[in-house]
A protein has these predicted regions:
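Short, small-residue-biased leader/transition segments that mark boundaries at the very start
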Residues: 3-8
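Structural signature of eukaryotic scaffold interfaces centered on beta-propeller domains
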Residues: 18-36, 70-84, 120-127, 138, ...
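Blade-loop segments of beta-propeller domains
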Residues: 56-124
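Surface-exposed loop and turn segments in beta-propeller and other repeat-based domains
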Residues: 61-71, 110-114, 164-224, 262-301, ...
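Beta-propeller blade signature
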Residues: 96-104, 148-162, 249, 338-357, ...
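Beta-propeller domains
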Residues: 200-349
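Loop/turn-rich, solvent-exposed surfaces of beta-rich toroidal or solenoidal domains
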Residues: 304-417
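Blade-level signature of beta-propeller repeat domains, shared across WD40, Kelch, NHL, RCC1
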Residues: 398-399, 404-454
Length: 454
């Protein structure tokens, strides 16, 4: 571990990691009636709280409630949030839970019927409800085949666990848009790491074979029953009762209560009529449109690529202008793989979106100048911290990419960075380095909320 100057807070950070980046070759369970889904996504969870010296101050004994031998309690723990009462909410597999920091159970619930395979996102919204990223447990495709879908449903749940609404993305977006799916590196698709596929991409023929062979499950592909969307964050906008999703394999999308797309923050490539009109226009600080062709733009503006955590900065946004923080992982940047793997980089980005004019301005970024050492091919977080007016960035899988200096080495030594940057600056005031751990997310924990204010 290492730290740079600490001048903004005496912080504790919750860290949600894995010890190993390699997924098991054989899972204990898979769905078979119907097939598909991501039940086998049951990685080890390593959840703790560290201080700014990197010392462990709290650890979650997840085995008490998380049993890999039980399909109803297995799953990787993801989507941690600290609620206003100081407790923690998160989910794993077929469950979503709430506990305080002393381990007291507030609730531990099965997902509602018709939904399965929670992962990634648990948003406690301003309307008192929670939005969970799940999947459909029994969807009949247009070709008549029944499947579990994969990471493409958002369910809204009230305080008592009742279903209020859901957003079925295969009915809202185009599940056959394949541009990003074909361009991305198949060696690292979120937590599915397979170094034997490093640098490989999918072709249109590969995608067609999946349909011909009836191949479904947690595989990159197109169509319901495959990992065509990979939604990894959900955020509620109270000004218009809408949600903002980060779809790793499509882009960032705002969807209204009427299930209509409000806008899309992504490369215009591949969007058909009905969606193409919703793609935001990039502009400079004077509001002048920026020329973009073939998924590349003039100047410093860039879309986000295979991104995570598209979150509204509530205190700086209003009903017309929205500030959005994004962790731009950077795989498939420009809808292609670069000539050399060490040309890849990740970014933390803030976009300013004028929702009336349908424009987007990039107002802050960090990461391009850091280059490949900070490249995080999967996972990651960018989050605004209102109490300190800083940007929290977790370069969660730095070091995972290929190490060109070591011949034949496709997986490097992991060294995630927990960083905080003062608003508008690009030099971190906090920089904590972790070694030999596979990161998912990290964020500051407020002890006053947990033990004093409530």
């Amino acid at each position: 571990r290492r730290q740079r100057q600490m001048c903004i807070r005496d912080s504790l950070y919750l860290v949600d990691n894995q010890l190993s980046p390699i997924s098991p070759h054989g899972a204990r369970f898979t769905w078979n009636n119907p097939s598909g889904g991501a039940l086998e996504w049951a990685f080890n969870s390593q959840v703790g709280i560290i201080d700014t010296s990197g010392d462990l101050r709290w650890y979650l004994l997840n085995g008490i409630i998380n049993d890999p031998a039980d399909p109803w309690t297995s799953g990787f723990m993801m989507g941690f949030q600290q609620t206003n009462d100081g407790a923690l909410t998160w989910g794993f597999g077929q469950r979503y839970v709430k506990y305080d920091l002393m381990g007291r159970e507030i609730f531990n619930r099965r997902l509602p019927e018709s939904y399965s395979d929670y992962s990634h996102a648990f948003d406690n919204a301003q309307n008192g409800h929670s939005f969970l990223r799940v999947a459909s447990s029994d969807y009949r495709r247009p070709d008549g085949k029944r499947v579990h879908t994969v990471r493409d449903v958002i369910v809204e749940i009230d305080q008592n666990g009742g279903v209020v609404d859901d957003f079925r993305l295969f009915d809202i977006l185009d599940p056959y848009r394949s541009n990003v799916v074909q361009a991305m590196d198949q060696g690292a698709v979120c937590l599915n790491i397979d170094e034997s596929k490093s640098g490989q991409t999918l072709s249109a023929e590969d995608l067609a074979k999946m349909d011909a062979n009836g191949q479904f499950g947690d595989i990159a592909g197109t169509g319901p029953g495959r990992n065509w969307a990979h939604v990894n964050s959900v955020d509620y906008d109270p000004t218009d009762d809408a949600i903002i999703i980060s779809s790793r394999h499509q882009g960032i999308v705002k969807i209204g209560r009427d299930k209509k797309v409000k806008w899309i923050l992504a490369s215009p490539e591949g969007w058909k009529k009905g969606w193409a009109e919703k793609v935001l226009t990039p502009v400079d600080h004077n509001g002048k449109p920026i020329k973009c062709e073939n998924s590349k733009c003039e100047g410093s503006f860039d879309w986000s690529w295979t991104q995570h955590t598209a979150w509204r900065i509530d205190s700086k946004s209003n009903k017309d202008v929205l500030y959005l923080s994004v962790f731009d992982n950077g795989d498939a940047r420009g809808m292609e793989q670069p000539p050399l793997p060490d040309m890849k980089y990740s970014r933390a980005v803030i976009y300013k979106i004028d929702q009336k004019k349908m424009t987007v301005e990039q107002i802050w970024e960090v990461g391009k100048e850091l280059g490949h050492p900070y490249f995080s091919p999967v996972t990651g977080l960018t989050k605004y911290m209102e109490d300190t007016d800083t940007m929290m960035v977790y370069w969660s899988t730095a070091g995972l990419g290929a190490s060109p200096e070591k011949k034949g080495n496709k997986l490097g030594r992991l060294n995630p960075h927990i960083c905080e940057y003062k608003w508008g600056e690009t030099t971190p005031v906090v920089d904590i380095v972790l070694w030999d751990t596979f990161g998912y997310q990290a964020f500051p924990i407020n002890l006053e909320k947990a033990f004093t204010l409530n």
